[in-house]
Amino acid sequence: MADVDRPKITGLGGVFYVVADPEATRAWYRDVLGLDGEHGPQMNWSEELGDKPYSLISHFKDDQYIKPGKGGFMINLRVNDLDGFIAMLTAKGVEVLDSVEEGYGKFAWVLDPNGVRIELWQQCSAPAD
């Protein structure tokens, strides 16, 4: 069977978690991150830098990478201009916890209103296949 014909996962369908105030959380994702949709925050995949759109599922032995986030998970969102996005978040009163640049991209972290850690990632080049 050719890879094209093989059943495969095609992307991240969603992130689902329990919060105390769903409407306030949805408003934060809409007003602060610019994500909105009929059924909640939504984003459409696009091909950037000539690569195939993708999401990564990572498993960690402990929660050190996710801290100070709560709930044992983190959401990674790709952005096209991390510096500009950080400036926009800062103007809206969002605290940026940290930012770094690695060989494969630039990263910054914030917490949503429920304490969920959000990792913002600007990819610097197409990933290796």
Predicted regions and their residues:
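Conserved short beta-strand elements that form part of the metal-binding/catalytic scaffold
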Residues: L33-G71, V110-P113, R117-S125
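Vicinal oxygen chelate
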Residues: M1-G11, Y17, G40, I86-D129
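Short alpha-helical
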Residues: E23-A24, D83-G84, G105
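Core segments of cupin and vicinal oxygen chelate
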Residues: R6-T10, F16-L56, A91
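Short, well-ordered beta-strand elements within core beta-sheets of diverse protein domains
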Residues: Y17, I75-L77
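Short amphipathic alpha-helices within nucleic acid-binding modules
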Residues: W28, D83-M88
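Eukaryotic phosphotyrosine signaling hubs
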Residues: L12-G13, K70-M74
